[in-house]
Amino acid sequence: MVTEADLRRIYGSIGDDQVSIGHLASAENIDVRLSLDALVTRHSAILGSTGAGKSTTVASLLRSIIRKDEVQGSPGARILMLDIHGEYTKALEDVSTVFSATPNQDQKPLFVPFWALEAGELLDFITGGLSEAHEIAFTDKIVELKDKGIKVNPRAGIDSRTLTVDSPVPFSLKQLWYELVDFETTTYIGANRDEPALEESGDAETLVAPKYQPHAMGAKGPFTNTAARGIRRPLNLLRSRLLDRRYDFLLHPGDWEPDLKGTVKSDLDKLLEGWLGHDKQITILDLSGVPSGVLTRLIGSILRIVYEALFWSREKSEGGVERPLLVVMEEAHRYLGPDAGTVASEVVKRIAKEGRKYGVGAMIVSQRPAEVDETVLSQCGTIIALRLSNPVDRARVKGTLPDNLAGLMDLLPVLRTGEAIITGEAARLPVRCRITLPCQKHLPRSNDPKVTQAWASRRSAEGYDRVVASWRSQQTNAVVQKLEITRSPIEDEPEES
């Protein structure tokens, strides 16, 4: 017979690296603890259908990891969360710093400098895709502008000999557009056809193109530039992107936006310090305001910046070896699909395969494990599986487990909300666990709408102009017209004598 004391020794062992996440589903007085070291360094996955309690499990687990309620705690914990739907900003507000593309007064603005992206990803976004010949025209000019930039502002670790098109060196997209459009539209006059027929010089800063005399037939010209690459269409799209306010967090990144000479107020060290070096244990990157067309690229860029920085600084005190980092990836199936082939997918595969050596751990969170790359999922040493109804998803989870544990997955369709089967390196034995619920004010913002209550209420005045304003601005808190209210004290009228 297994006694309660035996169960407590098996599942509730106490140690420096043990964190409590809940209790046995069959015995509420027996805690379930996981090894923090194994949970972070050997990666983990939290999987479950919509409504199974994934978000609550993540919020509860992160609070357990940082040990806020313990005397010693984990003041040096470092967790980076990619929050796709903005669910965790309230749930973790007391232990996190929030960066958002559409920040409110309690959040910091999220900026991801475009010049830190790989050239291929950047060009694919700002031009809509290029042929090989057209891409060369852009990459050659980017290298030229970056080279000019490091000559004006020398940067540690790089010079003209080691510079590549992918080097994270500031350059001006406005200057790139201006110089390329100038070359494409130039016309010439003169006997040797080498005198530019310029009428107005334009302005790179305001994205006004230079104006040349129009091409004319005959011996006098003006003559077109025969060396032009035929890239006016992608240049027009680049200009449109630069003018689109929805992409300011990427193309106009605050202090990280280069001027026309490539000079920036802040370098990447300040960006990393903001994300990873503040006084809270958790950093939430709220991506709910990011347009879907750029979301995957943005996530890939964030992960690349963070991982490359920690990889190359592994011998330093700020590196991952001295101060490990846990990256929590919500809605992972959206950017880690088996056929994704994106920067995000490639970086996460690197983290999954080699992150343990450099102190970077991954926590994959998904409602569709079947749509997550098998390489990534198979590298997760700990599986926290909540209710899963889809047989394809269950089969994918089964495939990550040893044969003798596959039978446990037959329980997944009947688990209660907030119940999970935990297997892997962080758990001493496979266990059916009831996850500890955070208090009401620390629950994620993922509740279903109260349909009956909402439909039973009398309709109030509806302003669909506000709906359209939010749609156009891509901000949920947009207003139709800002009102200025002037408040002045009321003066008593003099009494009649």
Over which residues does each language-model region extend?
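Conserved P-loop NTPase motor module
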Residues: 191, 206-214, 297, 417-497
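P-loop NTPase motor domains
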Residues: 86-92, 96, 115-347
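Charged, amphipathic alpha-helical linker segments immediately N-terminal to NTP-binding catalytic cores
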Residues: 1-23
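Conserved AAA+ ATPase "SRH/arginine-finger" region at the nucleotide-binding site
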Residues: 100-104, 111-116, 383-392
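Conserved ATP-driven motor cores of ASCE-family P-loop NTPases powering translocation/secretion/packaging/pilus
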Residues: 128, 344, 350-434
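Glycine-rich phosphate-binding loop of nucleotide-binding enzymes
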Residues: 18-102, 374, 422, 454, ...
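Hydrophobic residues in beta-strands of the RecA-like P-loop NTPase core, especially within AAA+ ATPase
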Residues: 82, 329, 365-366
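Conserved AAA+ ATPase small/helical "lid" subdomain
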Residues: 136-158, 410-441
